[in-house]
Structures are given as C-alpha cells and as structure tokens.
C-alpha cells in the first residue's frame, strides 16, 4: 500500500545510504563506480518513465503510486479478448445467508493474531531479502498446514509462484465445477522505505493484516465440505502476492500469466490493510470499512457494498486511493473485474506503515474480523453465483 508520508529521517540519512550508491573521492570529485539499473514505471494509465531504484523509493516516500512494468509490459495487451470480462453480471442481492452465517461462526481473532505474530517476527519481508524468502516459505507452509488439517489434500492445492527475486508469491486453489475463477488477494511483503535491505519492517498492518485476514477466511472456507468437495460452480483462489511494495511486481507477473493463458477470472478482491481504526476514531467518525471507488470495477464494488450490509456489523464508506495503489490494479490492467476494501476512509488509514513502527499494538482484531466476515461472504456468494447470465456493466476505470 502506498501513502503520502513526510519524515525528517531522510534529512538525517547520508545520501549514499539512502541511494545505495558508493562513491570515491578523486581530487575533490565524486566518481560513481556503477551506473544504477533503470526500471520502467507507470504513474498513471499510459504515463511511463525510466527511473533508478533510488528514484522509486523517493517516489514512494513522497506518496506517488506506480506500477513497475519493466518485465510486464505485455500485461493488458490482450484486453481486446479479456475486455469481454468487463460485462460480468454480479448478484442483485446476497442469497447464501444460512451457509455464510454458519461458517462465520468459525472465524477467530485468535487465529489471526497468532499468524500475525509469526509474520511480524521476520526482521523484514522485503521481497529482495532472504527474510522475504523465509517469510514466503512460512506462508506456504502455513497454508499447506491448513489444507492438511482440513483433510482437503485430495482437492485443494497450494504452491509458490516463483519470481526472479527471492520472495515467491503463494497461490491456493479450491477447484469448482468450472474454471471460472474468483480470487481473494493480499500482499505478503513489507518494506522500510528508508533502507529496505537493512532496516526492520514488521509490516503488521501493511499488509500483514490483510495476509492473515484472508488466511483466516481460507481456513474457515475449508470447513465447507461442499466447497472442498468441488460442488461450487466456480473455482476459488487465494493469492498472497510478493513485491507489492516494489510496484505491484508479484501480482503483475501472475495476472500477465493468467491473461496469456486465457484464464476466466470473474472477480478479484484485494485486502490491503485491514486492522487500523484509531484514525477513524480520532476523526470523530464511526468505525467503518473503506470501499475504494476509483480504478475498480463498479459492478463488483456495488455488490461488495451489499455483502458488507448483509454480513458485517459496521457500515462502509466510499473512498479513493489513486492509480496502482494495490494489487487489484494488476487484475484490472489484465481486464479482470477487481475491487479493493481497506480499513477506513483513505485519509484516516494507518500512518505507521513503511517503517519500524508498523506494529500489532496499533491494530484492532475486532476490525479485522469484520473484514474477514465481508471476505467470507463475498467469496462464498460468488463461488455459487451463475456468471453465465449476461449484463452490461460500466467498464473499469483503468
């Protein structure tokens, strides 16, 4: 997740440390030993520029969202085919109250807390670090443990989606009767924007909270024997993306692959930052969840509002976060309907992120439970929804 943050830390850090460049003194002149690598980023649809890694972190520290498209320039090029997916018919109302209500009773705050305590115990989950590799290994191990405990090994799978950097993404798949797919996502990486390779980044809220929220939903959904047994019409996937903080790198790689394969993805929901309510309370506003309304699919977003009204005990508020603010943007660029729900109105969200102070102590597990209820309701409703009916929707704002 990307936010506008200002800090005096930058002024206190030597430029060589922030940039990672090394120089030598030669008769008063600084001589740079190596030309830094360049990356192609997209700041808004069609607006691109080449930057160094130092430039990337400078942009992030100044609140600028972007997609690093250096290795994913083909993402979205097949949208002439996938644009037909924009005309997806979402339900008019929720119809699985009995089943979702029974399952929701199995969602626990304790489970999310235990998983988040483990996830934040890694010094950082920076995608280029060995800690990031280790944390992604733990995520896959935990998901496989959930599958085994549910006795679902014969039908449900989990695997790494490898990248050119150490940290892998993780994909869990619950097959349905068709390959029509509903995806729930979160990003597992964290970052310290000042010295990513050195300083700690516990990433409790960004996005440890989303990671363990959808992990808890996955755990609970496997208690539905009909879903595990393949009775649902649609396939369900849970994604834990690597390298969101580097410019949506992991999710872009996955959705570029899905686009090339012609995968039939009808809906993708991103859960990025689900635990901070203090900002809302300090603003004198009622606790709520923030439904993102820009650069998302309007039909899916409208149905998510209905899901929140049906299954959550707190209301929704509309809010905006800009272009490429989280991994749902990768799905949208591939032509797949996507949406994003965050912990609050954007202006009241967590400001402790991207440093050493993104800690569990600032989070509300009661609030995370509301996100879990919403996610469970959405995924169960859509797992059983007949997407074969036709409807004309407004296209995503891309």
From Swiss-Prot:
Keywords: Aminopeptidase, Disulfide bond, Glycoprotein, Hydrolase, Metal-binding, Protease, Secreted, Signal, Zinc, Zymogen. Its EC number is 3.4.11.-. Its main location: secreted. Gene3D superfamilies: Zn peptidases. Residues 21-87 form a propeptide. CDD domains: M28_AAP. Zn(2+) 1 binds at residues 187, 206, 272. This is Leucine aminopeptidase 1. It comes from Trichoderma harzianum.
């Amino acid at each position: 997740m990307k936010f506008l943050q200002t800090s005096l830390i930058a002024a206190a850090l030597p430029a060589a440390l922030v940039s990672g460049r090394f120089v030598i003194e030669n008769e008063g002149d600084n001589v740079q030993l190596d030309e830094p690598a360049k990356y192609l980023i997209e700041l808004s649809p069609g607006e691109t520029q080449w930057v160094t890694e130092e430039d990337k972190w400078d942009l992030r520290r100044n609140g600028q969202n972007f997609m690093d498209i250096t290795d994913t320039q083909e993402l979205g090029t097949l949208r002439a085919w996938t644009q037909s997916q924009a005309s997806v018919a979402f339900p008019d109302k929720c119809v699985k109250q009995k089943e979702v209500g029974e399952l929701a009773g199995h969602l626990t705050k304790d489970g999310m807390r235990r998983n988040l305590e483990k996830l934040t115990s890694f010094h950082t989950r920076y995608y280029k670090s060995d800690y990031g590799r280790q944390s992604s290994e733990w995520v896959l191990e935990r998901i496989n443990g959930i599958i085994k405990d549910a006795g679902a090994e014969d039908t449900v799978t989990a695997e790494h989606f490898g990248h050119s950097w150490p940290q892998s993404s993780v994909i869990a798949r619950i097959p349905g009767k068709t390959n029509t797919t509903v995806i729930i996502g979160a990003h597992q990486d964290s970052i310290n924007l000042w010295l990513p390779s050195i300083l700690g980044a516990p990433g409790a809220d960004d996005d440890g909270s989303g990671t363990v929220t959808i992990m808890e939903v996955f755990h609970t959904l496997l208690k539905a024997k009909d879903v595990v047994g393949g009775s649902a019409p649609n396939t369900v996937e849970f994604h834990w993306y690597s390298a969101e903080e580097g410019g949506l790198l992991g999710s872009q790689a996955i959705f570029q692959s899905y686009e090339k394969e012609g995968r039939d993805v009808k809906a993708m929901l991103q859960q990025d930052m689900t635990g901070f309510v203090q900002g809302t309370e300090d603003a004198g506003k009622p606790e709520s969840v923030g439904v993102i309304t820009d650069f998302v699919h309007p039909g899916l977003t409208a149905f998510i509002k209905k899901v929140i009204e049906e299954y959550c005990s707190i209301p929704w508020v509309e809010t905006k976060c800009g272009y490429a603010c989280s991994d749902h943007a990768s799905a949208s660029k591939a032509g797949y309907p996507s949406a994003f729900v965050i912990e609050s109105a954007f202006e009241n969200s967590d400001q402790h992120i991207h440093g050493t102070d993104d800690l569990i102590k600032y989070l509300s597990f009661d609030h995370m439970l509301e996100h879990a209820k919403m996610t469970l309701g959405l995924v169960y409703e859509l797992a059983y929804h007949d997407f074969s009916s036709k409807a004309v929707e407004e296209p995503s704002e891309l």
